[in-house]
Amino acid sequence: DHMSHDVYSPRL
């Protein structure tokens, strides 16, 4: 579980 760059949740 690593949220480096939003891959699962893209920042729009």
From Swiss-Prot:
<keyword id="KW-0964">Secreted</keyword>
<protein>
    <recommendedName>
        <fullName>Pyrokinin-4</fullName>
    </recommendedName>
</protein>
<keyword id="KW-0027">Amidation</keyword>
<comment type="function">
    <text>Mediates visceral muscle contractile activity (myotropic activity).</text>
</comment>
<dbReference type="GO" id="GO:0005576">
    <property type="term" value="C:extracellular region"/>
</dbReference>
<keyword id="KW-0527">Neuropeptide</keyword>
<comment type="similarity">
    <text>Belongs to the pyrokinin family.</text>
</comment>
<dbReference type="GO" id="GO:0007218">
    <property type="term" value="P:neuropeptide signaling pathway"/>
</dbReference>
<feature type="modified residue" description="Leucine amide">
    <location>
        <position position="12"/>
    </location>
</feature>
